[in-house]
């Protein structure tokens, strides 16, 4: 079976990451893959970098009319305004297996076009572990914005929200800016914040903890929770008693909410910033059900409508690793590479076979629902 990949240009605003990097393209080409890469005005990688790695650069959006045998590779979901049937095989994060808003329409496009979806979120090894994830950099970037928002509140009035953010050249540039913002807050008399991280033992949580440490917080300031600490079920008063709460869990089944408005709407609440890295905003089982807006880089926070206590904001950006697009892309693509090399045997390779079967199960679920 052939393996011809077509990397489409991302269309989500501020999405500068890529599922394939010039580094991984070079390896794939050396193994006999044919790679097409669309020109992209927002990718952190230049078209010339891909060309030098052996890819053929093609026009933006040309995947729509590409031969059917090409596998279309991307990261984020396709534009909502597109409704035409999907006839290609796609590798991407589709966000349609957990009853997210619009899931029926997304799967319906594949059904009507005869296409196939390999959802990146559900590519798993034999132990059930994801073969590639952006979790570490999602946690790292989320913690950075959480600290920055907390520091902003110490040095600005409640009428001023955290301003727009943009991708950073590298980790050190991000850490330096956030650490400097915290120093300004300390000069104003603020004490170092106490940060509660739920999901602290996972990829995402470890990234969050590492950022906090690099910005000068010590272990006594970082409250690390995981399955053992949340086993009793929420909501948890400890969240309202922290200065910053970072949710890093992977939501795989309904759970009790971690926090609710009853705990937040109190005059003695310390919590100032919630970072919902998981960003299950449209999931009916969102464990942080105190907001309903997915925030973006141009407007990174949304205010929680409390009537008592200090101003409280939520950061719910669903593409946080884009804050460090080059490093996040390189790490993700490197992890994905071994599975990509198995694409010529995708009908028997367990990673791809499981993903195909999962797609078929959800398509059948959609069909059954339509027959009711």
Curated annotation (Swiss-Prot):
Pathway stated in the Swiss-Prot or TrEMBL entry: Amino-acid biosynthesis; L-lysine biosynthesis via AAA pathway; L-lysine from L-alpha-aminoadipate (fungal route): step 3/3
Pfam families named in the record: AlaDh_PNT_N
Disulfide bonds: 204-248
Single GO MF annotation: saccharopine dehydrogenase activity
Any GO BP annotation: lysine biosynthetic process via aminoadipic acid
GO cellular component: cytoplasm; peroxisome
Binding locations of NAD(+): 129, 202-203, 226, 230, 250, 277, 317-320
Keyword vocabulary terms for this entry: Amino-acid biosynthesis, Disulfide bond, Lysine biosynthesis, NAD, Oxidoreductase, Peroxisome
Active site: 76 (proton acceptor), 95 (proton donor)
Binding-site residues, L-saccharopine: 17, 76, 100, 130, 134, 278-280
UniProt cross-references to SMART domains, sorted A to Z: AlaDh_PNT_C, AlaDh_PNT_N
Primary enzyme class: oxidoreductase
Entry-linked InterPro entries: AASS, AlaDH/PNT_N, AlaDH/PNT_NAD(H)-bd, Lys1, NAD(P)-bd_dom_sf
Entry's EC annotation: 1.5.1.7
Record has Amino-acid biosynthesis as a keyword: yes
Task of the protein: Catalyzes the NAD(+)-dependent cleavage of saccharopine to L-lysine and 2-oxoglutarate, the final step in the alpha-aminoadipate (AAA) pathway for lysin biosynthesis.
PANTHER family, per the entry: SACCHAROPINE DEHYDROGENASE, SACCHAROPINE DEHYDROGENASE [NAD(+), L-LYSINE-FORMING]
UniProt protein name: Saccharopine dehydrogenase [NAD(+), L-lysine-forming]
Species whose genome carries this gene: Eremothecium gossypii (strain ATCC 10895 / CBS 109.51 / FGSC 9923 / NRRL Y-1056) (Yeast)
Gene from which the chain derives: LYS1
